[in-house]
Amino acid sequence: MKIGVHPNNLHLRLARLWPGAFEEFDPEFVGYREGRDTAALLEKGDIHFGGTGSTPPIEADARGLSAVYIAASAPRPANGAILVRRDSPIRSAADLSGKRISLIDGSFHTYLLARSLEGAGLGLADVIRIESGDSDSLRDLVEGRVDAWVTMSPRLEKALTHEEINLLVRCGSTIPNRSLFWTLARHNIAGETGQAIAAELDRVGRAVMADIDKAAALLAAETGSEGDAQSWAKVLRSRDLSVVAAAENILAEQQEEAETLYRHGHFSLPVLTGQSASTGGGR
């Protein structure tokens, strides 16, 4: 089985490093740059499933690709946030109107921003979205090229130690922010296989939580790692790495997000979210 791995999905990144992970699946871990590339790789057959935040599978459904949900992590309340400069006049989401906001657009960042704005009576059209790409977004924020920055672990933890940065919104109070593991209907992953994938993700996640120092050392030793073992241990201790098979509650969360993003004009047409592989059928 070809399993997609990108730097921002900690579960699969750890699975690639963890001894014996997915052994029964004869795994080939396929590295790629970021979660928004997942649908294209699934479409080409380069991977059989991947893990992302909540938005990429909805983007896939918007393109008519028929996303199929396999599993979901626990909510990740500490994994994402909107940051501003300490000297900024921005004190609440209502103050973001007309401001330049750096984010990975089309990821869960877009949903976090939309829900935060909605709570203040604003919409995505009321702000200027700046694609962060490969730029140094922390520097862009500190030096005033953007007014706010939507970010996630492990960059978030580093940014929060910066003396010039303030936390505006933490995603835990705004969206579930789960890690989702999904495929496309064309790959025909059977219900039993989906259940087995979910169980293995959960097993690895619980093994990591039982030996955080080992997992942190593995992450720190990766080429181009974003932090040392101590900083990775801090990230891991903030996470519940347990995983469950995708069920109706997950599909309902995804549909709520799809409707929110449509309401904000991110999608031009309504999107019906995908089915669950682990239950062997549709909604």
Regions found by a protein language model. Give the residues of each.
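Pocket-lining segment of extracytoplasmic ligand-binding domains
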Residues: D136-A220
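A bilobed periplasmic-binding-protein/Venus flytrap-type ligand-binding module shared by bacterial periplasmic
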Residues: R16-W18, G80-I90, R178-T193
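Short helix-initiation/N-cap motifs at beta->coil->alpha
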Residues: F29-A40, G53, V127-E143, P154
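Short, polar/charged alpha-helical segment
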Residues: G4-D37, D61-R63, Y111
